[in-house]
Amino acid sequence: MTNPENTPMTTTNEGGKGLTEYEAKIYDRSIRLWGVDAQAKLRQSKVLFIGINGLMSEIIKNVVLAGVDSITLVDDHIITTSDLSAHLFINEDSVGKVISTESVFAISELNPLVTIDVYDKEIETMDDQFIKNYTMVVISDKNLNNVSKVNSLCRKNNVSFIFSHSFGLKGLFFSDLNEFKYFTKTTTEPPKTETHISIFKSFKESMGYDWSKTNSRTPLPFFALSTLYQFEEKHNRVPDNISDSDLSELKSIINSSIEKFNLKNTDSNKYFEETKDLLNKMNIEISPVCAIVGGIVGAEIIKIITQNMQVLNNFFFYDGVKGTGLVEQF
């Protein structure tokens, strides 16, 4: 049998690394959609996924089918029955096993051309040398302090970063691409390539956004996320949703923010109720929500890697009750 890796090369228009004839055949439909240059960029990209929950399984599915070079999974969580409701890669026989290693077989069946690695690595031990290996890092973690730590590493090493999580019928993602360049073709003859630059903020900076600059359409989950982040940055843990002292501290954080940003006539209770709602539903994943948010995040990852169109900057909020999605920049 001919080794696909040894087949002749189909060079990209930019003269860089191209696709083998075998790859060009496998990814024919994708190439027709976004072009051979974009597919070649995907085939050179390496994506690190931290936290392999139901939402992340949807994101991974979309990225693997798109045809990246390799993915790395980091999550030593032991599977329980509660993990089965929205996860694409595990079943009842998976209970009691490590979620990252248990997901490998199902992922490999989606696209055998993608290399899959599993790392038993704690966020605390991740360093510049480790992060530099990747084109992009995607994380789903309940501890927002962990999210901020990984984001800082990515930002320092100019690695694209996405955080995404779902909370029952709600979901969101945040992206930090530092200084992101993308290229478009003009409609003139002959067509010219135009370069565009988008500037992104870090997760920490966005969480410190001035609440007084928000408006009535600003999604309540943003305020809740900011409140939870302030707690977790201080304690390096997620608040206990049945702890009176933790809930009391969350209330104090909200009141302090209202005072800090001079938000007169503001009902602090609506922010507190939203914060409690996100906290209570942090471990609840619903399949349709994961599929919708995961599809959007997957599409963003493809746009980021291929650099051929504008990307969302920097928050996306999905509300499954209203059936609406909203992009905001904080």
UniProtKB/Swiss-Prot annotation:
Pfam families (alphabetical): ThiF
Keywords of the record: Nucleus, Ubl conjugation pathway
Source domain of life: Eukaryota
Assembly: Heterodimer of sae1 and sae2. The complex binds sumo via sae2.
SUPFAM superfamilies recorded: Activating enzymes of the ubiquitin-like proteins
GO BP field: protein sumoylation
Function: The dimeric enzyme acts as an E1 ligase for sumo. It mediates ATP-dependent activation of sumo and formation of a thioester with a conserved cysteine residue on sae2.
Entry's family note: Belongs to the ubiquitin-activating E1 family.
Any one cellular-component term (Gene Ontology): cytoplasm
Primary residence: nucleus
Tagged with keyword Ubl conjugation: no
Gene3D superfamilies with a match to the protein in the record: NAD(P)-binding Rossmann-like Domain
The keyword Nucleus appears for this protein: yes
Localization of this protein: Nucleus
Source organism: Dictyostelium discoideum
An annotated Gene Ontology molecular function: SUMO activating enzyme activity
Stated name of the protein: SUMO-activating enzyme subunit 1
InterPro entries: ThiF/MoeB/HesA, ThiF_NAD_FAD-bd, Ubiquitin-activating_enz, UBQ/SUMO-activ_enz_E1-like
Membrane-spanning ranges: none
Pathway it works in: Protein modification; protein sumoylation
